[in-house]
């Protein structure tokens, strides 16, 4: 490692130990090497013993920067994996990260827009409405019509922090991939690369604006999801202005109950919104932590989600979607043979994998899980158990699906917070079955025909010319193949001649040696000369 990377690594370890985070790893679970490493850093002691463990974890992640804050945000949504004393403090990372100075934010916005804020806005609030790991949000009113808006600005000097941590993550990922064969199958370098891409995408607010516009168009007039309007005239790389929304934060359970919200329908709509984005639109919001999700307070009996912060989105191609849908349905139906075969067909495990053994392994993992009521099943635990099983069969995690997995965990975590009895499987199953029905059969064929017909009609006038060119190329190809074959035959003949001459030459040279021993010098000299000549001719034949 380079000195700068070693320094950053030491900084990470130092912060974690000074906040007493080694308590998260009980000593009886540690091997000798980590124990020795901890004892060797004896001067690094818990400096915040007066604070609870969850608060110490939150403060440590916040001190380490945006890469770590993002990790904490995901942990906070997994209340089925982490106890409340961990998840509750981490929830503050979603929109309560320590803000930077509001006057500095105003100055940054004015520099980017090229004029004083008063040119376009009134009532700019120096105090931020929300402060997150990447950006900070302030409120104002449009001078032209008095409309309430929010101004989002990227934190200053954040790029060097992210670059340093990502470099270190690459270094560690490469070391782990070389040292641990099991980790290599999980493609740690590719996972870090995907994570880097998502973080860097968040640093360009033009991308977020485009994503928000796309998502808003996808759910236009929808009762399930509302996306605020982006004011594109005021958007650039580090500043974005959008409509201000008024809603109840999805994590404010008391507020939702007080408003009379239908919690069951709200949780089910979260699952529906996720699967609609993935399978209908192939474009999904991939940062659905509670800080980015609000609920429309109007019509609480028919609740509507409000999605903010579209900096991270994911896309899937048709093959990925079909594979995922078939896998989900196979799980729902406990068709473990189908699950195993799909893994082989998709290339996630080697083609020579024993499907029977793989099926048995999956069954052993899933059957105890399905023994519980469906509403108690955690998809997070299913994924963890499946990964442990798949490692035995050399499964490679596909980096392009990492965002999807993370988003599904977010959605499940939110749904279970809103309605603990949420049956994720039964909520999603009808949606997936309907989607699969639209992908196969006569209806799907007619839909594909209708979709492609305009392109076919457009290309039809070109068919005669394309056919003529194909026939001409085919004739030329046949001629070239014939020439290659004749050249090959000529080469084989020359090689045969070369081998024959080499053998004759070798025989004559051996004979010349025998004749010399019998004192027949003239005959030996002639034989040797002819033998050498045969070798030269043989060499020439090979060269040709």
From Swiss-Prot:
A GO term from the CC aspect: plasma membrane
Record-linked SUPFAM superfamilies: Protein kinase-like (PK-like) (SSF56112)
GO biological process: regulation of ubiquinone biosynthetic process; ubiquinone biosynthetic process
Domain of life where this protein originates: Bacteria
Membrane-protein topology: Multi-pass membrane protein
GO molecular function (one): protein kinase activity
Key words of the record: ATP-binding, Cell inner membrane, Cell membrane, Kinase, Membrane, Nucleotide-binding, Transferase, Transmembrane, Transmembrane helix, Ubiquinone biosynthesis
Keyword Transcription regulation: no
Pathway(s) annotated for this protein in UniProt: Cofactor biosynthesis; ubiquinone biosynthesis [regulation]
EC code(s) of this entry: 2.7.-.-
Residue span, Protein kinase domain: 123-501
Membrane-spanning parts: 496-516, 519-539
Residues reported in the UniProt entry to bind ATP: 129-137, 152
Active-site residue list: 287
InterPro entries attached to this UniProt entry: ABC1_dom (IPR004147), Kinase-like_dom_sf (IPR011009), UbiB (IPR010232), UbiB_bact (IPR045308), UbiB_kinase (IPR050154)
Cellular localisation: Cell inner membrane
Function: Is probably a protein kinase regulator of UbiI activity which is involved in aerobic coenzyme Q (ubiquinone) biosynthesis.
Family: Belongs to the ABC1 family. UbiB subfamily.
NCBIfam families: PRK04750.1, UbiB
HAMAP family: UbiB (MF_00414)
Name this protein carries in UniProt: Probable protein kinase UbiB
Lineage: Bacteria, Pseudomonadati, Pseudomonadota, Gammaproteobacteria, Vibrionales
Gene: ubiB
């Amino acid at each position: 490692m380079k000195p700068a990377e070693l320094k950053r690594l030491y900084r990470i370890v130092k912060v974690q130990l000074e906040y007493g985070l080694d308590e998260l790893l009980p000593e009886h679970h540690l091997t000798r090497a980590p124990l020795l490493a901890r004892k060797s850093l004896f001067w690094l002691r818990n400096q915040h013993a007066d604070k609870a463990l969850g608060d110490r974890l939150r403060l440590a992640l916040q001190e380490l920067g945006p890469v770590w804050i993002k990790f904490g945000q995901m942990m906070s949504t997994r209340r089925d994996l982490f106890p409340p004393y961990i998840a509750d403090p981490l929830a503050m990372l979603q929109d309560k990260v320590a803000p930077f100075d509001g006057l500095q934010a105003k100055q940054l916005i004015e520099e980017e827009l090229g004029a004083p804020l008063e040119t376009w806005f009134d009532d700019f609030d120096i105090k931020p409405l929300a402060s997150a790991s990447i950006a900070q949000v302030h409120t104002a009113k449009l001078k032209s019509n008095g409309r309430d808006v929010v101004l989002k600005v990227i934190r200053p000097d954040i790029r060097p922090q992210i670059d340093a941590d990502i470099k270190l993550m690459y270094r560690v990922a490469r070391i782990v991939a070389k040292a641990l064969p099991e980790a290599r199958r999980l493609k740690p370098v590719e996972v870090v690369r995907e994570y880097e891409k998502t973080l860097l995408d968040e640093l360009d607010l033009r991308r977020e604006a485009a994503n928000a516009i796309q998502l808003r168009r996808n759910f236009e007039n929808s009762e399930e999801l509302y996306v605020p309007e982006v004011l594109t005239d005021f958007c650039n790389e580090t500043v974005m202005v959008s409509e201000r929304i008024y809603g109840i934060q999805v994590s404010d359970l008391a507020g939702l109950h007080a408003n009379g919200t239908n919690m069951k329908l709200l949780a089910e709509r979260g699952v529906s919104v996720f699967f609609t984005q993935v399978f209908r639109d192939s474009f999904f919001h991939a940062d659905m932590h509670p800080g980015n999700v609000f609920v429309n307070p109007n019509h609480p009996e028919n609740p509507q989600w409000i999605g903010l912060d579209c900096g991270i989105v994911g896309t899937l191609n048709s093959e990925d979607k079909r594979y995922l849908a078939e896998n989900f349905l196979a799980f729902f139906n406990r068709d473990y043979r189908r699950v195993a075969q799909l893994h082989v067909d998709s290339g996630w495990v080697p083609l020579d994998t024993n499907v029977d053994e793989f099926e048995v392994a999956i069954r052993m993992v899933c059957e105890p899980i399905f023994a519980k009521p469906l509403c108690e099943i955690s998809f997070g635990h299913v994924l963890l158990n499946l990964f442990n099983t798949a490692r035995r069969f050399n499964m490679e995690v596909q980096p392009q699906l990492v965002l999807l997995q993370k988003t599904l965990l977010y959605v499940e975590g939110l749904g279970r917070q809103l309605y603990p009895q949420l049956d994720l499987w039964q909520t999603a199953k009808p949606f997936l079955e309907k989607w699969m029905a639209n992908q196969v059969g006569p209806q799907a064929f007619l839909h594909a025909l209708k979709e492609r017909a305009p392109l076919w009609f457009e290309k039809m006038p070109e068919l005669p010319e394309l056919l003529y060119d194909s026939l001409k190329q085919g004739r030329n190809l046949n001629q070239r193949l014939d020439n290659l074959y004749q050249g090959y035959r000529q080469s084989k003949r020359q090689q045969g001649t070369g081998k024959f001459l080499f053998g004759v030459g070798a025989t004559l040279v051996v004979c010349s040696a025998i004749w010399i021993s019998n004192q027949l010098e003239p005959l030996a000299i002639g034989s040797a000369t002819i033998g050498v000549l045969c070798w030269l001719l043989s060499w020439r034949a090979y060269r040709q």
